Each structure stands twice: as C-alpha cells, then as structure tokens.
Amino acid sequence: VSANHEDQVALNIAVNLLNNANGTGYLDKLMVEHKLMGALAINESMNEAGILAVAIMPKLLIQSYSSAEKMVWDEINRVKNGDFSDEMFNSLKLEQKRQYASSLENIDSRATIMMNLFSQGKSWNDYLNEVARIESITKEDVVRVAQKYFSNNYLCVTKSTGKYPKDNLPKPAFSPVVPRNADASSSYAKQLEKIPEQQVAPRIIDFEKDVKTSKLTPLVTLYTTPNPLNDIFTFNISYGIGALEQPELMQLTNYLQLLGTESLPFEQFRS
C-alpha cells in the first residue's frame, strides 16, 4: 500500500510479526532454528503505490522450493488467523514508536523525513500524529489487513543458481550530454544563498563532566550518559581485543544474538 494509505501502519505491524529488528518474528524463527537459509517479508510504501513481498531461500541441495514455500505460508497463516500473543503485539507497537522517536535524534534522518513528507503531501504534524495511530491499532486491524493483502493473488518468481550466458554490448558512439542550464540557479536556490551562515563552534565532549564512569570489575568499565532528546537508551559492548588476536570473537558476536538469559528464553529476552 502507499504511504498515505489507511492500512499502512497496520500492515507494517503484520509484516513485523514475520520479520523484525529483534529477530523474534515467525520467519526469523525459521532461520534461527535452521529450517530455512533465509526468509524475509518486505513492505515498501511509496508515494503512490506499495510493494509487499516475501523472499525465501531454501537450504541448498537438500530442500525443495515447494517445502520452503509451505513453511513460510504456514507462518503467514498464523498472522492471518490471529495466532500471536498480546505481549508480542504490544512489543511490536512499542518498537514502531521507538523507531519513530529515534529517527528524530539526528539531523540527517530528520531531513530525510521532511523530504519524504513533502513528496507525500504531508505536514510535520502528520508525522507526529502517526505515533498516535500506532497506539490506536488493534489486533483485529492487523488480522484484517493480513487477510486482505497476504492473499492467493500473488506473483511467484523462482531463481535457480548457476551461470547464464551474457551478451557483451559494444560501447555506443554517443557524444556526452551537455546540460543547457548548468550555470543557472532557480529562485529557490537564490533564496537559500541569501540566508546568512552562522558560525557554530564545536562542542567537545568532556569525559569528566559529560560521561559517568563506573568501574564494575578490574576489566570492565561502564560509561553512561543521559539521552537529552528522548527516553530511549542504547547499550553497546566494546571489547578491548581484536579479531586477529582472538578470532573466536567474530563467531561469538553472532552467537550472542541467539541467546536469552537464565530466566528468559530467546523470544522473551529479545522482545
């Protein structure tokens, strides 16, 4: 569906039930449990139309396309039948709200949002109001859009591995295109040039004042600082050792993403 469509927010949540950033979607679990090499649901909402697609990669040599497709459809039907918990549903709504808030933390993403809003005919208030729309979405809304858009009316494209013949085309004898108005400026560009530039002094981080340092163990130091923009926190772990000295670290980082805790299984911990 398009970015302005009334079903766009609910469809995003339906797709996130299959794949999400936390790796707890139904298709994510197929990969974690090594039932498929890859499975990904995509919902791309553009200005006037949208793309809803599912990409599947069967296990090489030992799995057929039909069996892999059946596995994916079984998981899609779980969403269509409302087979997901309220806890998972509310967690995905919260994740959507977190993404909206975190996208406002830096000027680059804010500029991209403004550009997209302009092309979609929306205002900045429309963007802020979308958070309220997320909160108002119900489980019934998600089931309804899943049944509507994950239908049997779809195009299936299959790609086989191998080598294909290539046609080597000669370089055409075209002359370089010289733009007519390369030196011209629009009225908008001229208006921007008239805006005076402000000298902004860099703000250097002072680790003594801006960062709280806590020595947890002789080998572990915790650095914390408040988020001045919202109540979202980010937790990063950095090891003072390189992969050349200890190559196992490269595998460890991938393994840690699949673990839970002593009291919480993987799905609950990641959600």
Q: Would you name each region that the model predicts?
A:
Residues 4-5, 21, 42-49, 75, ...:
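Scaffold signal of the M16-like zinc-metallopeptidase fold and its non-catalytic homologs
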Residues 8, 24-25, 36, 47-51, ...:
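Extracytoplasmic
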Residues 12-14, 30, 54, 72, ...:
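Buried hydrophobic packing residues in well-ordered domains
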Residues 20-35, 48, 236-271:
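M16/MPP (pitrilysin/insulinase) zinc-metallopeptidase core fold and M16-derived inactive scaffolds
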Residues 28, 126-238:
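Proteolytic maturation boundary segments
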Residues 31-32, 74-113, 130-133, 154-165, ...:
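Acidic/histidine-enriched alpha-helical segments
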Residues 38-44, 222-225:
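Short beta-strand/turn micro-motifs at beta-sheet edges
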